[in-house]
Amino acid sequence: MSTYYKNPLIILTVCGLLLLPLTELTGLTTTTASEILIYAIAALGFNILLGYTGLVSFGHGIFFGVAAYAASIIQVKLMPGFIITPMILSVLFTTILGLGIGFLSLRLSGVYFSLLTLSFAAMTFYVIYRWTHFTGGEDGYGGMERPTLFGIDLNNQTAFFYMVMLIFIAVVFLINRLVNSPFGSVLTAIRENSQRASFIGYDVKKYRLISFTLSAFFVGIAGSIFPFLKYYIGAELVHVAHSGEILALSILGGSRHFMGPALGALFFILFRELLSEYTSSW
């Protein structure tokens, strides 16, 4: 029976189900509960790279923000009335982008890798901020809508929360299977001693690239949901500071523990929202 209590999938699922009454108990909104789950997905995805592969990226806000913009633009301009298809297409685009950025960034290692990802984040922010007629620039991008899905009106905040909850559970399941697979064991070996892993016969660069791409994929899932949370997005989603926030979530909860990043998202957003009730400038 004790194995059930130690299973991170079960624990995080239960925590997710308790999240809605917890936020209501603290006087916060259902929107906040949904935001916590979205950032928990992003942090868990980022932690594939940080906690399991041992690489520090300062550019993962790129994948969150680009997925958000892609989902928004696809829905508003190409697929009004749809939500799942724009999300899927945006995640696919973000994954390909992650593969490209990972291929270029992983030519370097250590602090140079981190600085290169930071440079990509700064460049992406500049492009989105300046590409006014396509992204809205400093005014941001709006016009997104939540349609009815399988007869359920997603404009209802509780219904939208449970949609995000289902995605969260699926992501937790997939990442849990991933990190506990032989592939996950190789990533851990690379994190502990990449030279030794190379001597054993593992292609370290290939595994790091796969890890980077998978991390971008899961962060992209979080980003694809975000524009439908508040019906608006801004260029700050791809800013270096936002990448730093995603990094902070993993570190705050504990990057060496599977559940740590999700708990980091919970503590960070709850603290931010509760603090805003007592200060006027948060």
Predicted regions and their residues:
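N-terminal membrane topogenic signal
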Residues: 1-12
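Hydrophobic alpha-helical transmembrane segments
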Residues: 10-11, 32, 37, 62-65, ...
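Single transmembrane alpha-helix segments in multi-pass membrane proteins
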Residues: 21-76, 103-113, 189-199, 254-258
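Residue-level recognition of pore/gate-forming positions within transmembrane alpha-helices
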Residues: 39, 68-69, 91-95, 118-123, ...
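Transmembrane alpha-helical segments in multi-pass inner-membrane proteins
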Residues: 61, 88, 208-282
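Alpha-helical transmembrane segments within multi-pass membrane transporters and channels
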Residues: 78-122, 263-267
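Extracellular/periplasmic helix-loop junction at the C-terminal end of a transmembrane helix
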Residues: 120-153, 184, 277-281
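Helix-loop-helix "hairpin" substructures at the membrane interface of multi-pass membrane proteins
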Residues: 155-234
